[in-house]
A protein has these predicted regions:
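Conserved small/polar residues in nucleotide/adenosyl-binding loops
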Residues: 290-295
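Extended, compositionally simple hydrophobic/Ser/Thr-rich segments
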Residues: 45-46, 53-65, 111-114, 118-289
Length: 297
């Protein structure tokens, strides 16, 4: 009986912890304002907005973007006493999604569904999540996470793609086609880009984060500063350069030429049979069976 009681107590504690993990608290401004606790009555509200080509998300909402022609749309699903505390507006061609100033709220669910014909920028500041619902076709686009938020979406076709993480957030995407790809991870975040086709790629990791790339590129420049890792052994490049400063690692694949420079205890592993320009230490050849997915595990 005592064992059963202990088991029930642990189960209730686990349930309580899970429930609490779904609770979001957001404060804009000072700490003097009273916290508004979300009701259990959920509503859907349409918000009229002007045309925009960039998206900026603050706080911790769940945002889904759908690319479609016609007028832009914004639909909010949340508690009825929370919806009017939101600040959703377009300024300088950017759709801002957040809360009004001097607001303190506690809520479980906040979904914002957005559609527009064109998008050239996505910025998440905080713990919010953004999902590209049906892919994205555009010219140049900049995608960034600052904080612990996440961005996900597949089937991106563009001219130039600048994608970055500053903090502990994550970015995941598959099926990317672009001319110029700029990848940056600063902090402890993780970025995973699968099935990429690019002409030129520059990827850097600063801190303890991880970047994983697969696909192909004509030319690549890789750099790691700190203890982070850059896994590109499944990202085939004709020409590549790899530089490590610190204890981090780079794993890459080059077919024609590979230049390597290391300082510290870091190293560079490679696939392929390229012409090599490398120092006496810090370079080793990967086995043919090695994959970035194995490194991710």
């Amino acid at each position: 009986m005592k064992a059963l009681t202990t088991f029930i107590a642990i189960a209730l504690l686990a349930f309580s912890t899970t429930a609490c993990s779904q609770q979001h608290t957001y404060r804009s401004g000072g700490f003097g304002s009273k916290t508004v606790k979300a009701s259990k009555n959920y509503v859907t509200k349409d918000i009229k907005v002007d045309n925009f080509t960039k998206l900026s998300v603050a706080g911790s909402p769940d945002v889904t973007y759908t690319q479609k022609s016609g007028k832009p749309t914004v639909e909010v699903y949340t508690s009825d006493n929370i919806v009017d505390l939101l600040d959703i507006r377009v300024k300088d061609n950017t759709l801002y999604i957040g809360f009004k100033k001097n607001v303190s709220v506690s809520y479980n669910k906040l979904e914002v569904r957005v559609s527009a014909e064109k998008l050239n920028g996505i910025a998440v500041a905080g713990s919010g999540d953004v999902e590209l619902k049906n892919g994205l076709k555009t010219d140049d686009i900049k995608i960034s996470v600052a904080g612990s938020g996440d961005i996900s979406g597949n089937n991106i076709s563009c001219t130039d793609l600048d994608i970055s993480i500053a903090g502990s957030g994550d970015i995941n995407s598959s099926n990317i086609t672009c001319n110029d790809l700029q990848v940056s991870v600063a902090g402890s975040g993780d970025m995973k880009l699968n099935n990429v086709t690019a002409n030129f790629t520059r990827a850097s990791v600063a801190g303890s984060g991880t970047a994983i790339l697969s696909g192909s590129t004509q030319e690549a420049e890789y750099s790691v500063a700190g203890s982070g890792d850059l896994f590109a052994s499944d990202f085939v490049a004709k020409k590549a350069s790899a530089s490590v400063a610190g204890s981090g690692d780079i794993k890459c694949h080059a077919t024609d030429f590979l230049k390597v420079r290391t300082s510290g205890s870091g190293s560079v592993g490679y696939k392929g049979n390229p012409e090599l320009d490398y120092p006496k230490k810090g370079l080793y050849k990967l086995c043919l069976l090695y994959t970035s997915d194995a490194a991710d595990e």
